[in-house]
């Protein structure tokens, strides 16, 4: 046995150690040197017709192929070394969480299961004796932990001296002749406990022998481990005797497909004959034998397919000793049909058993000399082991992982489109200086420049004063804000993907144009000169020295008198471009030779090429999060590399405004002192395709006066945040209209009209996108491909962390995220505390009144007095449940739950019911006189209905459930309870909230609709909730009303939060091209989702980013429909969109503005079931509009009442009501757990 183990260890070490070229060379040479011996051994064991005997030379060739493809040696080593020796736990996504719990908690798939494998039928057997046997094997630490945790706690204790690390399998067989039944009792003992017991009754068989095999010790086991051999007792069958052997093997999956066989009861006898058999030579194989069973009936039955030594349910007959040897040979033949590592291990063990333990029997059969048999047996065992493992290697080389040479000659004209973000210059500076003194040459010699036009007429309006004016415009943007890395898809096939990863840079934009004429105005009749400066801002601050106040009244529209264009060769360019080709199927890094790639493409409006010829290996994470192996190189050639990609226009405005006759001025003292002014203004410059935001302009001026010479410097700087819409930076000096002639003023007016309508074209202000016209790639790649025949878990094992570590980290991250969320909730507690008190006060009193009313009948003064007393005594106590729950979110109990119970079914149930049990039960116990209530069937607990229970806010859910379920009781005792306030919630809560909005009527003229709206809603925000509730029940206000449904949910993949904002109203925007407007009929609704990317530190309000329209479930046609039905009042400030992405950006931005600008009248929480019903209600679209009896305000009032637990609105038809119930029921059946409901 020790020598056999040594051989096994030798072969495994020879194979599984990280194979270097020298080791593989030695192994190949050894196989080639033993080729003759292996051929003889194969012929001896498997017969002359066996394919193994003829494949020895091909095996050597395969090994040489391994050497030729030196990359395959790493793949083979990784594959073999990646076979785990312990059970693995697979990583499960959110959708498979139930499967995960089943795999972890359910004992049945994990505890060992045992089956009888093969039954050898033969002649009537007599005297079958009872027998016992046992098999023991060691357990790993992981297996010990699993079994100890999952074994039944009531397991019987067995007095056994074995160690805890050993599992003992016992089988006791007894034959009941009267019943013709052979009974086998199988037991499993570990850690001195009986953890498994199974009784097998085998009826109708005259059993000669049977075998047992352990299937798997854990459901995720993925390894074939070396077999352990156990001898079964001999069974006497008349004059024949057979020694059978069982192999205890661990396997991964067991086929459940049955194979046909004959029932033993129908067999009378079996005749085995040989075709052309020559018993003298001993050269017989299973192919030469035929079996002819004689049946007692025509009944065919199915016996489960067996696993183990025979791998088939072959019927074997035993007539004498020689025949049993040939039967053994038949088993060998069956083995030759095995594949992979299983075949190698079993063949090796079979050879060792045959040649070491039974060599005398073999010698007697094949007449081998006794003196050489032992050495031959040992040598044969070694060579057989090498042969089996060589087969395994050859199989891997052929079917599993192999480095291949791919000669690529790609020349694709398939076009690929990528959309890029706007590109904004990092640093731009302009200096414009003009100096004019008394007596200088006429100004007409230094004319204005206006987009190439000469304006000599300006000279007529200039005064004789001397002014030196310097205009400086600076635009500075952080490098990491714009021009970030992009990925451009160029080509994709079944095998590889070609990508470009550009990084953009900007020229140093410094452009000077001299001279730019500056003009001044001098009133000779006054003692001081007036100068006019307009920086497009509005401020009123004193100078730093306090001599003179600087005043600029209001803001005015700027218009250009000079437009400065940055030349095309001084704008955006590529700083670097990476050429990336990734393989879809490679399981190891790839390399290549003689590679060249080129892309012909448009970037913005410029077309050119980029090419690369030097590549290195890399790893790339694609958009789906999968790791790909590939090659990357920097583009070093091509016409696009140094080309200007986008012309950037910056305007310098000098003089003029739409009302040129208007005089604005800044006055300051002529005293020779220095003054400083500064101020800020908010400028918004919309640009198509950009992300909605704005920049802040800061201006400062420095003025000094010496000897009637004015030096004025104006500096404008732009400070940008994360995203901008600013497209232009300018400085402007203003000329009083009186200083210019009528002709000049008329000309400026014309130019103003022209430039006021002239905006930057989109393609000039930004790089709209990239279009790949042609992709060229050629060269040789060495790719190590995988195959579908190898489980994906093998590759995962090679490229990812241990699954158990991933699960632990996932749990830790989840706990951290939940704790962060709970801390987030702390800032809400102060806001919600009053609302919680209101709910508890109402519900507590409601329950008490209901209980007293049941005893005393109608409400009487006695009942009222008793209610007030009880209410006062229990008011403070009722808040304890919520306070405990709030504290539990961040204190030790929360951490204990997350740390010890998350991931188990028990822990999930505890956490799901934590908020509901703590809050709702606490209130209900007090309401019902300390008798725990029974929740009625059909009511829905949001904790059970919401999948994302871990990161949801349990306080809000409990609050909403209670309010919706029992809120009706408050109305029923309204005559008793004097406090009729309702719950107040804001639109920034995480759970489902319905809010009613009102806005001015768009069909009325602007002054009238604003006036009526103010009069109608005046002072409403200061009224209490009951007054607002009464206000919305009056449905004849001169306003338009709509409602929103808002809630948060958690993204399972990222753990981030997402806000859903659904708008609903009569005649509101919709994705179905339904008519809109204040008087149109039909229910319009649409939904926008936002990713919550943070919380404002000062206000606690959520900072959100729109989700792409495809992720919101819309088609392109539906997006355009929503955009067209938005209404001019919501998109009047937006430029016309060019693409569907632009339209969706306008929709998201306008939707967000709606909830900020329109007036929110009242809000209420809504339970999960009613929110689902409202979703179906909105899909009906039908509404019988009537200005007086059934208008938009009736619609929102009905929606609000239904959200608060009221009846279905009257405008909903009966068939829609029925469909609502069915839709909600189906949804609950899909997502809800009704345990305990």
Swiss-Prot record:
UniProt keyword Transcription, yes or no: no
Listed GO MF terms: peptidase activity
Source species, domain of life: Viruses
Keyword ATP-binding: no
Active site location: 1040, 1192
Domain PPPDE per the UniProt entry, residue ranges: 1006-1222
UniProt KW keywords: Capsid protein, Outer capsid protein, Virion
Name this polypeptide is given: Structural protein VP1
Source species of the chain: Rice ragged stunt virus (isolate Thailand)
Origin organism lineage: Viruses, Riboviria, Orthornavirae, Duplornaviricota, Resentoviricetes
